[in-house]
Structures are given as C-alpha cells and as structure tokens.
Curated annotation (Swiss-Prot):
GO annotation, cellular component aspect: plasma membrane
Protein name: Elongation factor 4
UniProt similarity note: Belongs to the TRAFAC class translation factor GTPase superfamily. Classic translation factor GTPase family. LepA subfamily.
Subcellular location: Cell inner membrane
Gene for this chain: lepA1
Length: 597
C-alpha cells in the first residue's frame, strides 16, 4: 500500500488540466501511442468542445520512479466548474493529494481557489504546479506570489512544467510521490468504499467508480449501499487505465470500478458508501448529501407531438446525470412540457445542448427561476419553484428568496464596474481584499438576480477577466411580488415572474412594451397589461388593422360617414368579445432576453 498514490488535479477552466492528465497517462504508458488522443479523459463531445470536464474519470497508472520502485498512481479527474462542486468534493475525498495547476501567464482564478479550499478542508495535500511555462507571456515568479497571497499555499517549490510540450512532467510525478502521503486503510476491516461517480452503460447497467477505504472487495460478494440500504451481487471489479481492465479484487487504498447489475443511477448515489451485506461497516463515510437542484426552467417541445420523445430523451439523460430532475407540467400557452431542475446555469445549458444535439429536439425554454420558500398564514412552510403556482397573496405571510455568497476575482482595473453591477443586482458587499494585482470581492446576492444574465454581464463589464464562483447560503425574507402578464384580459401563465417590488414597475413596463412589438396585429385592439395582484402597473395596446370604410363616400353628408364608422366600431367590439390571440414563440424568447440596460 505504501506505493499507492491517489491524486486529483484542480484547475480553472483552460489552465491545462486535461492536457496534463494526457501527458501523465502517456508517460506512464497507460495507452499506446496509437490510442492516445487529446483530452483522453473527457469522453463527451460537449466536454471536448467547451474544454470543460463534467464527469469524473479515473486512470490507474504504473510509474517507475527514479528511486527504482514502481508506484501505482490513481489519477481522479475532477470537474472544474462551480455547478459540480459536490462532485468535486467527493472526488477530493477519495484522494490524499491534489495537483493545483495554475496557468503561468494568467495566474490564479476564482474556481481554482474555490476547489482548492475544498481540498484543504478535506485535509488533502496540495502540490502547486505552474503550467504553460513555454508561453512567451508566462511570469512564474508573479504567479507563485499570487498562489501564496490568494490561496495561502507555500509555492516556493512549485514545479514548473509545460503539459503541451511535455517539459517537466516527470518532475511533477517525482514531486507528487515525495509530497503526497500514501493512503491509510486496513484491508482486514469490513469493506468501506466511497462512490466517487457512477454512470450508465447499455450493456452492464450502472458502473460505479469507487475508492476502497477499508477492506477487500471481490466479484461474487454481496454488497449493500448504506444510504439506500439496497443490496446487489457484485459481478465484476477492475480499474481504468483509462480503458477498463478487470481485476481479481480491489483492496484498501485502491480506486476502481464495480459492476453489480444495478438498473438505475439513483440507486448508486455519488458520495454513498458501499459495504458488504454479510459483514457491514458500522458507519458510513462522512460527507454524503443529497444534491438539490438550485435552478428550474420549463422545457417545452416546439411541436406538441414531440412530448413523448422529449420525455424519453430526458430519461436517457437522467441515466447518466442523477442530479437532473424533471416532472411534466402543462401551460395554456405552450402546451405540454417538463419542469426541470438543474444544479446551476452551466448544468442547465449543458442539458439543453445535449437534448438538442444528441436527441434532435427543438425546445422552448422558459426563463430560469429559483426555489422560493413561503411562510403561509396557516404557519406551514412550503417551497415552490414555479411562479405560476404561487398561492393568493392573502394566504402568504412572507416570501423568502435564496441568497448565495458569491466570490469574484478580477484585475484591479475592473473593480468599479463589477461593484456597480453587483449593487444593481441587490448585492451586499461582505469583503474585499487585494492580492497582488488581483482583487477578490465577496457579495451576498439573491440567486434569482444571478440566474438570468449575471454571468454574461460580468464578463462584458470586465472584458472577460473576472471569474466567479458561488454557493448557497440561506433563504431570507424579501419584498417579492408576482408579476403577471395579461393579453386581452387573460393571464399568460408561462410569462409569470417573481420580482422584487422595487424593480417590479420597471420590469412590467419593459416586458409589456417588448410584447407589444411582438404580437402581430389583429382585426381588433389587443391590450397587453402587466399586473401585480389586481393592480395593473403597465399597459400597451396593439392597434387594430382597419379597413377604410369611407373610401366609397367622396364628399357627401357627414352623418352618412358617421353611420359607417359607428357600424365598423360595433363590429370590432363584437369581434373583440369572441376573438382570441395567438402568441408567437418569439414573444416567449423575448422575455428571456429582457436586458436590464
């Protein structure tokens, strides 16, 4: 066991994490040159394209060190994005060490800070690595200082390498073997294995990626999940090198996979503990929690006959993504669709993109909303995620909105614009510290202000230099109201929003004027109104098209003209009583793009 090293790589997007992983795999001969391709561990197309890692992957490698011993290195690749922070914390819990990869030209960024703190909390040894030293803009001295100022890790002995050219990768491995402690665990104790990740395979069912903490696991053993209490028969165990290789057993300290004929992903929850059914461990490994969706949106097929196909596509996605939740809902304006829950904005985008790409779906997405907590007059507390389900105002004592803590990291020049943006979004500044040339701002901010367009606006005011990460803090009471849009006196449920009272009149006006441009003219006047409860706060009218009934009159008597105009008016009035208005798709999309200029 003293020759095993379990480690993961922490880095911000684009700092060269996957490339470094490729080089390490190549150096240890995990794959032949023929099978080697760029970003071996990112298996989904969308992961490659966006250059992000979504699912955790592993590679068990053998490395012959300079001291002549052969070490077993288990590389656990972690997602780098804040939406997947729970997956990151589980990946890190399975390691004893982590390589903190920092781009020698860009310096430290927010997400690597966040994941690094997670690592330090878990008691993981952090080894700083400066990547991309072959770039002309690289400034290793400054970046080392930044690592010490921002993260507080001693970086004087940071290894320098260039994953692209392969320079210094061997030094990274040597330093790692020297600094990262071997795993502790007892092969004699009852089995305890932590599920790092799980995914679905069409042939064998769910494949669980585990780190064995104590005990030994062999095929034909009966295993039990500690969170769900379900038991299964273990069919196969093995390791990934990144290709799967079956093994006779997995013992304490090792990282590998278990196949046990499990049908659904929800039975193998990330962070759960696997133990033997006939000799169970006394308690589970710490840190398991159910992941709760933070952001909700309605997904509707453009063609209503695609509803079943959408359900199937969502179910297939759920096989590989246990954190995706959905339930059918119907809207009088958009027909049948699903209300889906996501971990965050990136997660939502990825799910949408995969539906459109892998399953050829045409989707309409309603504006993303968050979960609100309501305290009712009856004293009960309920949570709603759909604005159109909000009960009557008379039954509600208070509405509480989710508040997040958001950490922003940016160069000094952009502090002003970023602070203005945060204040506009009702943020409260909690902290501000200068570290070298970077500034770190901490704000408490309502999540519903962030979900619409905060990220895009942040990038534009800081010219792309600011990076952010956020975590949920608490539900807090706020003065929120439900804004309804009415067309011709009828409420359109898909357009309801929950907004802050101070912002409501402004949002109402903006929406209504946008709607007026988008609803095609009919034969009668259409009133588009925004209301809060029974109060109309804004109104626009889509004017009717009318025929010139006086065209045949040349000159003639004024009373004759009056009669014709009155008759036309009567007709329009009758039409208005029976007419109904089709709202085009563009109108819904426009609502999503109401920019608070």
């Amino acid at each position: 066991m003293k020759n095993i090293r379990n480690f993961s790589i922490i880095a911000h997007i684009d700092h060269g994490k996957s490339t470094l992983a490729d080089r390490i795999i190549q150096l240890c001969g995990g794959l032949s040159d023929r099978e080697m391709e760029a970003q071996v561990l990112d298996s989904m197309d969308i992961e490659r394209e966006r250059g992000i890692t979504i699912k955790a992957q592993t590679a068990a490698l053998e490395y012959k060190a300079l001291d002549g011993q052969v070490y077993n290195l288990n590389l656990i690749d972690t997602p780098g994005h804040v939406d997947f922070s729970y997956e990151v914390s589980r990946s890190l819990a399975a390691c004893e060490g982590a390589l903190l990869v920092v781009d020698a030209s860009q310096g430290v960024e927010a997400q690597s800070v966040a994941n690094c703190y997670t690592a330090i909390d878990q008691g993981v040894e952090v080894v700083p690595v400066l990547n991309k030293i072959d770039l002309p803009a690289a400034d290793p001295e400054r970046v080392m200082q930044e690592i010490e100022d921002v993260i507080g890790v001693d970086a004087s002995e940071a290894v320098r390498c260039s994953a692209k050219t392969g320079v210094g990768v061997q030094d990274v491995l040597e330093t790692m073997i020297a600094k990262i402690p071997p795993p502790v665990g007892d092969p004699e104790k009852p089995l305890k294995a932590l599920i790092i990740d799980s995914w679905f395979d069409n042939y064998v069912g769910v494949i669980m990626l585990v780190r064995v903490v104590d005990g030994v696991l062999k095929p034909k053993d009966k295993i039990r999940m500690m969170a769900t209490k379900a038991t299964y028969l273990c069919e196969q165990v093995g390791v990934f090198t990144p290709k799967s290789r079956p093994r006779a057993s997995l013992s304490a300290g090792e990282v590998g996979f278990i196949i046990a004929g499990i049908k659904e992903l929800t039975s193998a929850k990330v962070g759960d503990t696997v133990t033997l059914a006939d000799r169970p461990a006394s308690e589970a490994l710490p840190g398991f929690k159910e992941v709760k969706p933070q952001v909700f949106a309605g997904l509707y097929p453009v063609e209503s006959n695609q509803f079943e196909a959408l359900r199937e596509a969502l179910e297939k996605l759920r096989l590989n993504d246990a954190s995706l939740q959905f339930e059918p809902e119907n809207s009088s304006a958009l027909g049948f669709g699903f209300r889906c829950g996501f971990l965050g904005l990136l997660h939502m985008e990825i799910v949408q993109e995969r539906l459109e790409r892998e399953y050829d779906m045409d989707l309409i997405t309603t504006a993303p909303t968050v979960v609100y907590e309501l305290l009712l007059k009856s004293g009960e507390v309920v949570q709603i995620e759909n604005p159109s389900r909000l009960p009557e105002p008379s039954r509600i004592t208070e509405i509480r909105e989710p508040i997040i803590t958001i950490n922003l990291l940016m160069p000094q020049d952009y502090v002003g614009p970023v602070m203005t943006l945060c204040n506009n979004k009702r943020g409260v500044q909690r902290n501000m510290q200068y570290m070298g040339r970077q500034v770190m701002l901490s704000y408490e901010m309502p999540l519903n202000e962030v979900v619409l367009d905060f990220f895009d606006r942040l990038k534009s005011v800081s010219r792309g230099y600011a990076s952010m990460d956020y975590e949920f803090l608490e539900f807090r009471a706020a003065d929120l109201v439900k804004l309804d849009i009415m067309v011709n006196g009828e409420r359109v449920d898909a357009l309801s929003l929950i907004v802050h009272r101070s912002n409501s009149v402004y949002r109402g006006r903006e929406l209504v004027s946008k709607m007026r441009e988008l609803i095609p003219r009919q034969m009668f006047d259409i009133a588009v109104q925004a209301s809060i409860g029974a109060n109309i706060i804004a109104r626009e009218t889509v004017k009717a098209m009318r025929k010139n009934v006086l065209a045949k009159c040349y000159g003639g008597d004024i009373t004759r003209k009056k009669k014709l105009l009155e008759k036309q008016k009567e007709g329009k009035k009758r039409m208005k009583q029976v007419g109904n208005v089709e709202i085009p798709q563009e109108a819904f999309l426009a609502i999503l793009r109401v920019e608070d200029k």
